[in-house]
Amino acid sequence: SGSTGRTTVGQLLTPAGQLTTLGDLPLNEALSPDGRYLIVSNNGQGTQSLQVIKTATGKVVQTIPYKSPESLYMGLAFSPDGTHLFASAAGNHKIRTYHFDCGKLVETSAIQMPVVSPKLTKVNLYPAGLAVTNDSKRLVVADQLADAVSVIDLATNKIQTTHIGHRPVWVTLSKDSTKAFVSSQGGADVAEVDITKSQPLATHKINVGFHPNKSVLTPDGKSLYLSLIHI
């Protein structure tokens, strides 16, 4: 009431803004490069979904549902020109890809993540956080259950994977897209990964508080802000 609003999970906000009703367990969102649309990934029980919200009105203009066993996860990333969106589908061992135009998503061919290692052992990469390089040529993936990070060549879908940290969950790229900063929830650290080589290379580890999650780089590229679930 008045200037205070209540969110769908019971939190009180003052002053109250506009609330948009979403699906179950929204874990992540991605703003289109032009700022006109917000994509939300809903990752709860039963039917999961992607929703497209028009930022000028707060209205949901498209919902794409996925019934079990099809799934989504927290990874969402636009190409720099805003024409393509990538969404992780961890339970399905793939990255979903979409064409995006005028507020509408059209799903195209998915990128299949490997389920067998070069040594022919079973692997479950469980793709989580995603980031696209400035030239739109590569997609960087945090492989949460494999303790690894992968770089995908978007022209060939060739995947190069390097082991890092413990339970990596989020990826943020440097301003020039030469480095990836990968948050490891189980390792209480952020790994700095050189992605300019044919094989990604972890070069530095930054120890942070317990359970690091999402991060964002300042516009000048000099500072990385990180959310910690437990301190």
Give, region by region, the residue ranges found by the protein language model.
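Conserved small/polar residues in nucleotide/adenosyl-binding loops
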Residues: I229-I231
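Short coil/turn segments that connect the beta-strands within blades of beta-propeller domains
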Residues: D34-R36, D81-T83, D135-K137, D176-T178, ...
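Short loop/turn segments that connect beta-strands within beta-propeller blades
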Residues: K54-G58, F100-G103, D153-N157, I195-S198
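Surface-exposed loop and turn segments in beta-propeller and other repeat-based domains
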Residues: Q18, I64-S68, T108-K122
